[in-house]
C-alpha cells in the first residue's frame, strides 16, 4: 500500500518524503480546500522539483478540490503556465467542470476523485472510471466491507482511504456550521471548525447549567436530550474523534485499499514527520521488511503527537464513528527546532575563527581602556556574563550543524533528536552547545530570530527534528488552548 502524507508547504513536503511517504499531496494557491495552509506560491516549483529529484520515485498529488465558480475557472486558466512548472503526478478534484481542462493541459497527470465528492458506492466509482479517473478517495463514511465490494466491482480503479487524522462530523466539506456562524465556507477552503469550539452559557444561566439540569430538547422528540454544559464547563457541539487505523492496516490491505492517506495539511512539521514515520514503520512491518517488535515503539510514538481521542471511524460500523469528544488536541512535547546538513570543514573553521576574533577584539578594547574603566568593565562582566559570551572551542569528535530554532530553548535543556529511523536520541547538557555561527559566541538560549548552530558529539542527519518536553503538559489533561 502507498503511504500518502500531507504537505502544507515546501518544508512539510521535504519532511513527508524524508520520513517515509511514498507520495505527498499539496494545494496550489486558492484552489485547495485548505486555504489556511501555506500552500504553494511564487517560485516554489523549483524547490519542489529539486525535492522530486532528491527523492526519486516519490509522487506528488495536487488538490484542486474546491467547488469552482466561473471566476475560479477563469483564474485557473489564467495560471496554467504556472501550474505546469510543478512536477505534478496527479490532480485531486471534486468538481467535474475542471476535468476536461486538466485532461487537455495535463495529459500525463492522473485524475483522482476527491473525498469531497462523497463516493460511497461501486456505481459511482464505475462512472468516474469511465470518465478517465484512475483513483478514488472514498468517503470516510465507507466501511471496510464496502471497500472490498467496490474493489471487487472495479478492480482497475485505485482505492485511497484516509487512515489517520481529523474527521468531519458531516460528509466531507458539506457542513454548513462554519458558514452559518462565521461566514467562512468549508466548500471554499475556509472552514473555521466551529464544531470543535467550546461553548458555555452566560452568568445568569451558569448555576443552572453547572447543575446538569440545563439541556436542549427537540419538540417532537422529548427523549432526545442534548446537554448544554459538560466537560470542564464547556460543550463541544459536534467534535468528532480523530481517525486512527495504524493497528488495522492488514484489514485495510485485505479490503483492497491501495493508498493510505494521512490528514493534516494544516498540521505542523512535527506532526507530519512523526505520523508519517509511524505509518511507514507499520507498513514496513506488514511487508516483512522489519519486525513488528521493531515497529512497535514508532507506532507508540503517535501518542507523542497532538491528537484527540481516537476511533476507527466507519470502517467497522457506524457506532464507533458517532462518538464525539471534547477539548483540543495536545502533545507532551514542544518542537524546539530543526537540524540542517553538517557544516563542512571550511565552514566549521570559519565559525571557530570568528569566535577567536571576537575574544581578541574584546581584549584589544579592554587594553585600550583607562584602568578604572577597565576595572568597571570587568566587574560588569562578572555580574552579567551574558554580555561577554565565551567563544566556541573545538572538541574532538564533535560536529557543527545549522540549527533553526522554532521555540525559545535555554542552553542545557534536555534535547530529543528525532530522525526517520531512530526513535529518539537524548542530548543532555554536557553533549551539546548552542553557538552563533556568525561570531562564534556560545549562546545561553536560542529564539526563532537567532542565528544559531548546534555543536554536539552526535552524528545527526539533515532534517532531524529537535523537541523538548513541555513543562505545562499533564498526562490525561487536555488543555483548551491546544498545542
What are these language model-derived features?
Residues 9-12, 30-105, 109-122:
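Active-site beta->alpha loop and helix N-cap motifs at the rims of alpha/beta catalytic domains
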Residues 1-19, 23-33, 59-64, 71-77, ...:
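Surface-exposed amphipathic alpha-helical tracts and adjacent flexible/coil segments at the periphery
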Residues 91-94, 116-120, 134, 138-142, ...:
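Short, well-structured alpha-helical patches and their helix-loop capping segments
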Amino acid at each position: 500500500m502507498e503511504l500518502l502524507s500531507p504537505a502544507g508547504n515546501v518544508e512539510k513536503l521535504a519532511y513527508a518524503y524524508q520520513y517515509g511517504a511514498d507520495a505527498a499531496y499539496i494545494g496550489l494557491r486558492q484552489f485547495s480546500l485548505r486555504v489556511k495552509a501555506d500552500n504553494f506560491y511564487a517560485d516554489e516549483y523549483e524547490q519542489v522539483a529539486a525535492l522530486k529529484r532528491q527523492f526519486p520515485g516519490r509522487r506528488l498529488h495536487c488538490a484542486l478540490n474546491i467547488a469552482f465558480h466561473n471566476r475560479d475557472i477563469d483564474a485557473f486558466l489564467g495560471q496554467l503556465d504556472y501550474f505546469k512548472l510543478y512536477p505534478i503526478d496527479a490532480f485531486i478534484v471534486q468538481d467535474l467542470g475542471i476535468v476536461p481542462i486538466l485532461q487537455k493541459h495535463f495529459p500525463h497527470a492522473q485524475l483522482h476523485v476527491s473525498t469531497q465528492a462523497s463516493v460511497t458506492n461501486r456505481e459511482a466509482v464505475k462512472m468516474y472510471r469511465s470518465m478517465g479517473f484512475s483513483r478514488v478517495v472514498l468517503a470516510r463514511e465507507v466501511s471496510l466491507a464496502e471497500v472490498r465490494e467496490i474493489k471487487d466491482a472495479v478492480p482497475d480503479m485505485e482505492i485511497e482511504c484516509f487512515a489517520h487524522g481529523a474527521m468531519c462530523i458531516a460528509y466531507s466539506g458539506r457542513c454548513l456550521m462554519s458558514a452559518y456562524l462565521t461566514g467562512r465556507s468549508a466548500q471554499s477552503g475556509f472552514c473555521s471548525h466551529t464544531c470543535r469550539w467550546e461553548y458555555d452559557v452566560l452568568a445568569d444561566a451558569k448555576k443552572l447549567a453547572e447543575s446538569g439540569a440545563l439541556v436542549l430538547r427537540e419538540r417532537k422528540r422529548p427523549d432526545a436530550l442534548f446537554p448544554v454544559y459538560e466537560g470542564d464547563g464547556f460543550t463541544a457541539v459536534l467534535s468528532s474523534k480523530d481517525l486512527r487505523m495504524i493497528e488495522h492496516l492488514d484489514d485495510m490491505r485485505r479490503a483492497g485499499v491501495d493508498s493510505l492517506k494521512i490528514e493534516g495539511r494544516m498540521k505542523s512539521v512535527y506532526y507530519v514527520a512523526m505520523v508519517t514515520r509511524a505509518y511507514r514503520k507499520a507498513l514496513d512491518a506488514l511487508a516483512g521488511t522489519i519486525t513488528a517488535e521493531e515497529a512497535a515503539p514508532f507506532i507508540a510514538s503517535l501518542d507523542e503527537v497532538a491528537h484527540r481521542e481516537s476511533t476507527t471511524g466507519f470502517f467497522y460500523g457506524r457506532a464507533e464513528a458517532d462518538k464525539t469528544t471534547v477539548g483540543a488536541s495536545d502533545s507532551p512535547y514542544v518542537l524546539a527546532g530543526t537540524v540542517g546538513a553538517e557544516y563542512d570543514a571550511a565552514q566549521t573553521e570559519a565559525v571557530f575563527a570568528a569566535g577567536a576574533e571576537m575574544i581578541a577584539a574584546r581584549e584589544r578594547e579592554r587594553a585600550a581602556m583607562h584602568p578604572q574603566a577597565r576595572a568597571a568593565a570587568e566587574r560588569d562582566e562578572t555580574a552579567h556574563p551574558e554580555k561577554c559570551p565565551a567563544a566556541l572551542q573545538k572538541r574532538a569528535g564533535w560536529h557543527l550543524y545549522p540549527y533553526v530554532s522554532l521555540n525559545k530553548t535555554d542552553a542545557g535543556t534536555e534535547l530529543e533528536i528525532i530522525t526517520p529511523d531512530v526513535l529518539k536520541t537524548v542530548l543532555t547538557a554536557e553533549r551539546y552547545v548552542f553557538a552563533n555561527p556568525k561570531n562564534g559566541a556560545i549562546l545561553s538560549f536560542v529564539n526563532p530570530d537567532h542565528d544559531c548552530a548546534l555543536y554536539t558529539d552526535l552524528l545527526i542527519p539533515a532534517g532531524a527534528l529537535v523537541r523538548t518536553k513541555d513543562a505545562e503538559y499533564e498526562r490525561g489533561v487536555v488543555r483548551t488552548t491546544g498545542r
